[in-house]
Amino acid sequence: DWSSDVCSSDLGAATAMVMGGPGAIFWMWVSAIFGMATIFVEASLAQKYKTVDENGEVTGGPAYYIRAAYKGPFGKVLAVIFAILISLALGLFGNMVQSNSISAAFNSAFGIDPMIVGVIVAVLAGFIFLGGIGRIASVTEKLVPIMAVFYILGALILIIMNIGNFPEALRQIFVGAFNPGAALGGFTGVAVSSAIQYGVARGLFSNEAGMGSTPHAHAVAKVDHPCDQGLVAICSVFIDTLIVLNLTAFSVLCTGQLHEYNQSLTAAELTQAAFESAYGHFGAIFIAICMFFFAFSTIIGWYFFGEKNVRYLFKHHPAVAAKVYAAIVVVFIVVGSMLKVDLVWNLSDLFNSLMVIPNVLGLWALSNVAKDLYDDWKKQPAKVK
């Protein structure tokens, strides 16, 4: 998913550096490397335990493989806990981060009141949630990959223009991972634990490996073997964290925008400052437009992940529950646009972390199943393309 990859990487990298210094990027790399193995298992198990819902649509995700992992009351309760947490973490608190970022970017570029932006985003999202997908979703789907390509090209040109600062940017990342104050003067008061904390937390937000969110998308893919989708999932994390994330990080560091420790600075504003240094005010406008499409697409995707779990929780009245959930999400989108950025991120971090617990318990219990799937996959004849 181009939108989720680019948006989460942009927001994740920028906020990690604001809160934990340049060294947080190093810990995002570390989390991505471990995350590749985790997400391979998640996607493979999501494929193995997928099912068909009441509408005849293929569905799956952690709630389903957790039930398969633990028979009896414990498995049922654990699956319900996960479904509740993801419904809150993504649809509500995660989407608050997205609307907050869109609002901050538009306020910085055009001076528009954040609440007005939040209301517009909420109305557009509400139409899609309640069935009016049509043109809005279609236009977004077509424009997001184009915007992603422009964003990547813009970041590459920006880094090349400031290539002389690249060695210093690398130094700041590696030194800052273990001594934030030595990497950049403004981060003297930042402890190594903060670099690790925000690097891992934003890495989780960025690639979602271990959270249990992406298995919902991987479950519906049509593949010959469950592990084929596991490989796709690994590639997604690689592109997300080791390519897109680095473009954002080096854009900020090579242009020297992270010169002072300011936790009130938003991710969007930091990225806008980097692009403005090379492209003038057009850079801020460009990032605002990119942020809208990337974050808006992520809002839609995360809502549907949450909705799948709401339907799981309310099996007897899924349609009614989904509509109520949609209305609540719309309200949270508006509220998120107006709240302080650190509060929004803290809520998102908390629930993202809580999601990991039941999901990892399910993965751990099914580790032998995952190994059997992998062993069987290795025996498959190589496909001739």
Residue ranges of model-derived segments:
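Short, small-residue-biased leader/transition segments that mark boundaries at the very start
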Residues: 1-8
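Extracellular/periplasmic helix-exit of transmembrane alpha-helices
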Residues: 41-49, 54, 156-172, 180, ...
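Selective recognition of specific alpha-helical transmembrane segments in multi-pass small-molecule
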Residues: 34-42, 119-133, 144-164, 197, ...
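Flexible loop linkers connecting adjacent transmembrane helices
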Residues: 12-25, 37-74, 258-278, 307-317, ...
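Helix-loop-helix module between adjacent transmembrane segments
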Residues: 31-56, 62-63, 67-129, 290-300, ...
